[in-house]
Amino acid sequence: MLFTIIYDLFHFPARSIFWGAELILALFIYYKLKIPSGTYFAVLVLFLMNIFGEIFFGLFYIIQNFDKFIHLFSSFAVCTLFYSIFEKKISSKKILILFSFTIVLSIELIWEITEYFADNWFHLILAGVHIAGEQAFKPIEMVSSYEDTIYDMLLNFIGGTIFAITALFLTRTKKKLAKNSKKECHHKV
């Protein structure tokens, strides 16, 4: 991982800041937060998909819609992360689900705005889907940055919605199971 940041630092300085921040966040989550291992595993997979998709294997350029899958999966994984972090602090499960969903969509909005300004001010080519070889100085744009931004935000919304529906279903199922176990306890007495 450190190699990735160093490699990126010399080739794409602005992106290395992103990778470094993501690595620090992953280490913080692992060492400081008490979250379920499944949630941590999902966040780790997301981190590795970003690294391998961009740097090592170029999966963004090889596998069609790899970027789109990451946006769908990332919103689900990060919603789950925020749910796990704030589960003990917010007692209402519905508000907790809505809070997690809203935070993730807000982060996505900030990220897409950052991509827009990074592309327009620093010509970093963060938005859009491009084809680029090692020697390419001007990548070929496959999907425009505006279209890419809309699809990214839509897929993050869909991933967050899948999280919300799943979390609501699991919350209701858990309540029903708790209610049924209380009834069984009363019948046994």
How would you label these PLM feature ranges?
Residues 1-150, 157-189:
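Bulky hydrophobic segments
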